[in-house]
């Protein structure tokens, strides 16, 4: 499968998906992931407009951009264009997380690793324990090779 095309910069001041997608792109992707079957632009718009005032044409434009970025598939079903995600939310999160980490590690591996440990220690000690477990497991795996 061809990977999606994400922007080359992360928006550190944004939350969740909006770190790697635009704000409206993130809302559209969330709406698509919440549908269990291919959805029309109107159906996606109806989900978004409840919480975010936006025109249908704007949603159509964003859907087309997400198709170009290989995040969505577009197909004609019963004469209507319908959209589905190319990846599950979990698959996308894993891909985007890896891309973010690869980009950040290009800055300064040692400082990034130390900062990650410090931030987890301050904000989520359980996640720090999980990171420690993952590191130990990976080191054992590498020694066996």
Residue ranges of model-derived segments:
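Short, hydrophobic-biased segments on the C-terminal half of alpha helices
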Residues: 60-64
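Short alpha-helical segments that sit at the start of domains
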Residues: 2-29
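Short, cationic-aromatic polyanion-contact patches
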Residues: 21-24, 77-96
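Short amphipathic alpha-helical elements of helix-turn-helix/winged-helix folds
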Residues: 27, 31-35, 47
């Amino acid at each position: 499968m061809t990977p999606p095309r994400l922007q080359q910069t992360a928006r550190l001041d944004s939350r969740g998906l909006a770190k790697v997608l635009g704000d409206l792109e993130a809302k559209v992707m969330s709406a698509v992931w919440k549908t269990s079957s291919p959805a029309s632009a109107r159906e996606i718009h109806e989900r978004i407009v409840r919480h975010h005032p936006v025109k249908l044409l704007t949603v159509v434009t964003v859907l087309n951009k997400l198709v170009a970025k290989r995040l969505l598939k577009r197909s004609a079903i019963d004469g209507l264009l319908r959209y589905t995600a190319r990846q599950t939310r979990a698959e996308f999160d894993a891909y985007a997380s890896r891309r973010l980490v690869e980009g950040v590690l290009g800055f300064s591996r040692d400082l990034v690793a130390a900062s990650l440990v410090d931030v987890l220690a301050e904000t989520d000690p359980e996640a720090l324990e999980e990171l420690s477990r993952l590191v130990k497991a990976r080191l054992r795996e590498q020694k066996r090779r």
